[in-house]
From Swiss-Prot:
<feature type="disulfide bond">
    <location>
        <begin position="107"/>
        <end position="157"/>
    </location>
</feature>
<feature type="compositionally biased region" description="Pro residues">
    <location>
        <begin position="280"/>
        <end position="289"/>
    </location>
</feature>
<keyword id="KW-0732">Signal</keyword>
<dbReference type="Pfam" id="PF00445">
    <property type="entry name" value="Ribonuclease_T2"/>
</dbReference>
<feature type="disulfide bond">
    <location>
        <begin position="62"/>
        <end position="165"/>
    </location>
</feature>
<dbReference type="GO" id="GO:0005576">
    <property type="term" value="C:extracellular region"/>
</dbReference>
<dbReference type="InterPro" id="IPR001568">
    <property type="entry name" value="RNase_T2-like"/>
</dbReference>
<feature type="signal peptide">
    <location>
        <begin position="1"/>
        <end position="17"/>
    </location>
</feature>
<protein>
    <recommendedName>
        <fullName>Ribonuclease T2-like</fullName>
        <ecNumber>4.6.1.19</ecNumber>
    </recommendedName>
</protein>
<dbReference type="GO" id="GO:0033897">
    <property type="term" value="F:ribonuclease T2 activity"/>
</dbReference>
<feature type="active site">
    <location>
        <position position="154"/>
    </location>
</feature>
<keyword id="KW-0378">Hydrolase</keyword>
<feature type="disulfide bond">
    <location>
        <begin position="231"/>
        <end position="265"/>
    </location>
</feature>
<dbReference type="InterPro" id="IPR018188">
    <property type="entry name" value="RNase_T2_His_AS_1"/>
</dbReference>
<feature type="disulfide bond">
    <location>
        <begin position="44"/>
        <end position="63"/>
    </location>
</feature>
<dbReference type="InterPro" id="IPR033130">
    <property type="entry name" value="RNase_T2_His_AS_2"/>
</dbReference>
<comment type="function">
    <text>Rnase which modulates cell survival under stress conditions. Released from the vacuole to the cytoplasm during stress to promote tRNA and rRNA cleavage and to activate separately a downstream pathway that promotes cell death. Involved in cell size, vacuolar morphology and growth at high temperatures and high salt concentration.</text>
</comment>
């Protein structure tokens, strides 16, 4: 029996579809780490351990990011009010999370600056600034205050950006310029809007999209790794890309990994355009504090007592009144009569000399650095005051800090 070439081709195509049923759209695109370099940063050997690997803890911290070995590139979709170009998820930042998903913040006051824009101007980075003003835009406040917040909160926790990692004749704040270039370069490798558009997912005020389709479109352009998406009231709000890193933040290789968080998006996602046709803004999330601040007590779950005004746990007196405020760039602040609250030397503290720490909420629980659990060495008795710490570092007594509104 003989078959025509056309018949053979048809059969071959059918067999191919059975063996490999994925369409071209479903094919996984290899992620290419951006070419990064810094003339002033310490050179790193080729066998530098990958962050969060078994050898990372004992490696040269100028060449292996630790403990913040998970780098997270984050993007906004701000549609009401519209922020940035209509066809761009704008840049939020690049964050060093710990390998367990927790994170540090505002780690090194000696690295903090008053103005990222002024530093970049001083270093002659006008072209970089022009680009940042188009793609790295906050939904409130000035661009410079936003960039400065990102540097002071996140970049000061990056071990590979310390002064000791740079040559002695490097210009002052060269690490900041290298960091800004890196954040922009990594951002440009993950164009969320184009990834979605190629899969037929575009902003539409009358449609919803399946969460699985959203994720497939993003994952297939990220080495098949799971991308993180966040929603507010069913509307897409942020997209996060997770990496491990081989080498320094400013000259290393970014290696995609799976999302280590959990998505807040429903099965059907709204993706409104930035032209104002997307309807009314979503209602405030239950976890968002009132703009004017909310007053209440901070109780200890499963235990007697509460926090007093200096931030210590006390069981024999009156609970302090805390004000829960809205932090300018996400999260919440806490203030008592003693002053702003923060985690200082590993313990929750409220004092007039403190910076206003950035906390978040999980329901009524107070979260710091991604950790909703807190700890102390013992339960206080009598007139004793006991300090509390985020995570398990404070001791064997574990609990949540619960904000109870008055």
């Amino acid at each position: 029996m003989q078959f025509s070439l056309a018949t053979i081709a048809t059969v071959a195509a059918a067999v191919s579809a059975l063996v490999c049923p994925y369409t071209k759209r479903d094919a996984v695109a290899a992620f290419t780490s951006p070419p990064l370099s810094s003339a002033d940063h310490k050179s790193c050997p080729a066998d530098t351990p990958v962050s969060c690997s078994s050898g990372a803890g004992s490696a040269d911290l100028c060449c292996t990011e630790s403990p913040g070995g998970v780098l997270v590139l984050t993007q906004f979709w701000d549609w009401t009010p519209a922020i940035g170009p209509d066809d761009l998820f704008t840049l939020h930042g690049l964050w060093p999370d710990n390998c367990d998903g927790s994170y540090a913040q505002f780690c090194d006051k000696s690295m903090e600056v008053q103005s990222v824009a002024a530093v970049l101007q001083q270093l002659g980075e006008t072209e970089l600034l022009d680009k940042m003003n188009k793609i790295w835009i906050p939904n409130r406040g000035s661009t410079d205050s936003f960039w400065t917040h990102e540097w002071n909160k996140h970049a000061t926790c990056m071990s590979t950006l310390k002064d000791k990692c740079y040559s002695s004749d490097a210009p002052q704040y060269q690490s900041l310029a290298d960091w800004a270039h890196t954040v922009v370069n990594v951002f440009e490798t993950v164009n969320t809007y184009k990834f979605l558009e190629a899969a037929g997912i575009t902003p539409d005020s009358s449609k919803t999209y399946a969460k699985t389709d959203f994720l497939n479109a993003l994952n297939s352009n990220f080495d098949g790794k799971q991308v993180h998406i966040s929603c507010k009231s069913g509307y897409i709000s942020e997209v996060w890309y997770y990496f491990h890193l081989k080498g320094s933040v400013v000259s290393g290789q970014y290696l995609p990994i799976d999302d280590i968080g959990s998505s807040s998006c429903p099965d059907q996602i709204k993706f409104p355009p930035k032209d104002g046709s997307g309807g009314t803004p979503p209602p405030t999330d239950p976890s968002d504090p009132p703009t004017g601040g909310s007053k209440g007590f901070i109780n200890i779950s499963g235990q007697s007592g509460c926090l007093i005004s200096n931030g210590n746990w006390y069981t024999s007196g009156t609970c302090a009144t805390y004000t829960l405020g809205e932090s300018q760039y996400g999260g919440v602040t806490l203030t008592s009569s003693k002053g702003p609250c923060d985690v200082v030397n590993g313990k929750f503290s409220c004092a007039s000399g403190n910076n206003a720490g950035q906390f978040t909420q999980d329901g009524s629980n107070i979260v710091y650095g991604g950790k909703s659990d807190w700890s102390a060495p013992s339960v206080p008795s009598g007139s004793q005051q006991v300090g509390v710490s985020p995570g398990s570092a404070g001791g064997s007594v574990s609990f949540n800090l619960v904000f109870a509104a008055k």
